[in-house]
């Protein structure tokens, strides 16, 4: 029995990145061997075991044979005669098909080290096309390693395009699509994930609401990049600069979906695109089974992001209505999330990237002023029932009016 470190741990150590988890392959053993040594079997479909002390995953070397559609249609063969090279051959990318012996020697039959050095994402074999989930994984790796200069090999992109064209992506479950997307949103370059999906034709299949934004123009005065699809990617990149919050990044991705509904004869104007986009956000989130808190923020951002751009000229009553609409009294984190997504929208434009966004701080300060007026003080003054809510609103509007009167007169930007 021989044991090898494989996959991401080897790849990340060679890249000088932190290794967060370790996966091992066991060659020349049976399940009975590992169970007798105290390992705990956890894989139902595949022979995967947990080490009795470290709790690392140890998998018996295996081969896989395509037996049906999608990413679950495989027959697994895990016997002591399966070699390490055979096990590595079934993996997605060459950079993930490098093994390290217990002595520290590398075993690299598919030249993954060379591709690491050259910053190339390349599939190991044509068996790549048997698993449609790998299209999303490559897009995610492209996003994760974009800051290191990684590019997708031409032949790998061609294979991904072929898979998208042949309809294999239709067999992916919503949960798997969202899981990969959620991971991609957490990378330093989430926009790259969606750009790769567009380049291979997968965006139109999995995210048609986003794909439909390409080719839709916006006024050049406010959007020198003109194309709404390009603007959307720029805003996602900006959101990643501003916040690590996946909720913020996803909401930014969806903020302009309503522009895809504007009749061409009305271009490049998109009046009412915010509220119009809410139903598209709902449909996208329902289809991919996006968690409710992420969905709810995305819907609010779609509806109200343009209002934040004009926040400095809003009347106190309108400001309070905005705070009520986003339920900021019970969910105060939404105030910061809305400020950040609106800033990402404003700065996610050609030549606007380094511009200040004073509306964000104005919104934050307005909320601070309004929140200093508490319901407890209203109750203490003897108000009861519905009168508490009405008096609380009146006092908050008054506080906002006093504060607003002290602010410098500014013109809003869009």
From Swiss-Prot:
The keyword RNA-binding applies. GO terms for molecular function: ATP binding; CCA tRNA nucleotidyltransferase activity; cyclic-nucleotide phosphodiesterase activity; magnesium ion binding; phosphatase activity; tRNA binding. One of its GO terms (biological process) is tRNA 3'-terminal CCA addition. It catalyses: a tRNA precursor + 2 CTP + ATP = a tRNA with a 3' CCA end + 3 diphosphate; a tRNA with a 3' CCA end + 2 CTP + ATP = a tRNA with a 3' CCACCA end + 3 diphosphate. CTP binds at residues 8, 11, 91, 137, 140. Residues 228-329 form the HD domain. It comes from the Bacteria. Mg(2+) binds at residues 21, 23. InterPro entries: CCA_bact, HD/PDEase_dom, HD_domain, NT_sf, PolA_pol_head_dom, PolyA_RNA-bd, tRNA_CCA-adding_enzyme. ATP binds at residues 8, 11, 91, 137, 140. The keyword Lipid metabolism does not apply. Its cofactor is Mg(2+); Ni(2+). Keywords: ATP-binding, Hydrolase, Magnesium, Metal-binding, Multifunctional enzyme, Nickel, Nucleotide-binding, Nucleotidyltransferase, RNA repair, RNA-binding, Transferase, tRNA processing. PROSITE patterns: HD (PS51831). Its EC number is 2.7.7.72, 3.1.3.-, 3.1.4.-. Magnesium is required for nucleotidyltransferase activity. Nickel for phosphatase activity. Catalyzes the addition and repair of the essential 3'-terminal CCA sequence in tRNAs without using a nucleic acid template. Adds these three nucleotides in the order of C, C, and A to the tRNA nucleotide-73, using CTP and ATP as substrates and producing inorganic pyrophosphate. tRNA 3'-terminal CCA addition is required both for tRNA processing and repair. Also involved in tRNA surveillance by mediating tandem CCA addition to generate a CCACCA at the 3' terminus of unstable tRNAs. While stable tRNAs receive only 3'-terminal CCA, unstable tRNAs are marked with CCACCA and rapidly degraded. Belongs to the tRNA nucleotidyltransferase/poly(A) polymerase family. Bacterial CCA-adding enzyme type 1 subfamily. Monomer. Can also form homodimers and oligomers. Comprises two domains: an N-terminal domain containing the nucleotidyltransferase activity and a C-terminal HD domain associated with both phosphodiesterase and phosphatase activities. A single active site specifically recognizes both ATP and CTP and is responsible for their addition. This is Multifunctional CCA protein. It comes from Pectobacterium atrosepticum (strain SCRI 1043 / ATCC BAA-672). The gene is cca.
């Amino acid at each position: 029995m021989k044991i090898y470190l494989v996959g991401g741990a080897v790849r990340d150590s060679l890249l000088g990145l932190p290794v967060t988890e370790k996966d091992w392959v066991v060659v020349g053993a049976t399940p009975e061997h590992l169970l007798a040594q105290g390992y705990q079997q956890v894989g139902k479909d595949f022979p995967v075991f947990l080490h009795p002390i470290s709790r690392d995953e140890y998998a018996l070397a295996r081969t896989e044979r395509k037996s049906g559609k999608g990413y679950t249609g495989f027959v697994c063969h895990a016997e002591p005669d399966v070699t390490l090279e055979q096990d590595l051959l079934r993996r997605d990318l060459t950079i993930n098909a490098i093994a390290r012996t217990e002595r520290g020697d590398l075993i690299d039959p598919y030249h993954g080290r060379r591709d690491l050095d050259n910053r190339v994402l390349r599939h190991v074999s044509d068996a790549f096309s048997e698993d449609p989930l790998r299209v999303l994984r490559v897009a995610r790796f492209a996003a994760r390693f974009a800051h290191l200069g990684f590019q997708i090999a031409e032949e790998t992109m061609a294979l991904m395009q072929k898979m998208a064209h042949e309809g294999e992506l239709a067999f992916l479950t919503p949960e798997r699509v969202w899981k990969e997307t959620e991971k991609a949103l957490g990378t330093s370059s989430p926009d790259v994930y969606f750009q790769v999906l567009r380049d291979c034709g997968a965006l139109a299949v999995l995210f048609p609401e986003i794909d439909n934004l390409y080719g839709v123009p916006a006024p050049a005065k406010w959007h020198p990049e003109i194309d709404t699809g390009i603007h959307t990617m720029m805003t996602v990149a900006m959101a990643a600069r501003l916040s690590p919050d996946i909720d913020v990044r996803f909401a930014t991705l969806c903020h302009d979906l309503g522009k895809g509904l504007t009749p061409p004869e009305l271009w490049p104007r998109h009046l009412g695109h915010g509220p119009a986009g809410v139903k598209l956000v709902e449909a996208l989130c329902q289809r991919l089974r996006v968690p409710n808190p992420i969905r709810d923020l995305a819907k609010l951002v779609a509806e109200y992001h343009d209002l934040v751009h004009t926040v400095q000229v809003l009347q106190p009553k309108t400001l309070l209505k905005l705070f009520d609409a986003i339920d900021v009294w019970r969910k105060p984190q939404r105030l910061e999330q809305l400020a950040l997504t609106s800033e990402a929208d404003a700065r996610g434009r050609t030549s606007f990237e380094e511009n200040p966004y004073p509306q964000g701080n104005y919104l934050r300060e307005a909320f601070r002023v309004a929140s200093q007026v508490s319901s407890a003080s209203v109750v203490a003054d003897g108000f009861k029932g519905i009168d508490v809510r009405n008096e609380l609103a009146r006092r908050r509007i008054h506080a906002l009016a006093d504060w607003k009167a002290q602010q410098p007169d500014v013109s809003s930007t869009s």
